[in-house]
Amino acid sequence: MTPDARHAKDKLALTPELREAIREIAGTEHLLVAMDFDGTMAPIVGHADDARPLPRSAAAFAGLAVLPRTTTALISGRALASLRAVASPPVNTLLIGSHGAEAWLGPGSTGLTLEPEQKALLAEVRAVLEDIVKEAPGTMLEDKPAGVVLHTRLAPDDVADDAVAAARSVLQERKGVFLKDGKRVLETSVVNASKGEGVTFLRQITGATGVLFAGDDTTDEDALARLEPGDVGVKVGLDFTQAQYRVEAPVHVAELLEVLLQQRSIAVAEETPGTADE
């Protein structure tokens, strides 16, 4: 093996500290595995509809979903319908969409309902953003149940910066409108919610005694900030983070999930009474 090959392999490996943290949390009584999707389970792509989870990540996540005392969840900025379409999550995986504004907790879950005032405000927000997009080649809008997203990934940097600045100048003081910066996006919403609230909510309804969360975007910092002692937070990428641990890219998330599946499978098997002598 060449030095370059060894270096590439080393970069793919999880750190010993992260491996130990995974081993420890795998033994918790009830484990919540909560993952961001884009940039975490799936590589970032030019068109949102083309995103798909890496096969290894999807397989390990599905394996975790069927283990005893283990809950899997996706916490995404995507609308729930979009998240389901691209992620194809295991049937019992809980879903938090639109940065916490939407939730699917199983059959019978009700959808998000906006008040008339919120609907009117959302229409105003879209009209503002439509005018901006007309003058900013490469930008586009994405509608969500509670907001509109200004995408700038395909625009030149100067065009993207000007478009976001124009949107902020009009909307940041508008009462009832909430803005979030993401990677080449500006999220607008008429519902004040965050991925942090999503993590806290899922912990409460599942009774989780330990949470592992991984995410790549600035909006994932809200979720990382809500983690408690004994939880494991993982930043995907090289940007600033308050997470205890870091991996470089979605391919490393696949490795993380595979290690977690292995360790959690061992932990729940050791705690399950045998039937050989019965």
Language-model features: where?
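Short amphipathic alpha-helices and their capping/turn segments at secondary-structure boundaries
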Residues: 13-29, 82-89
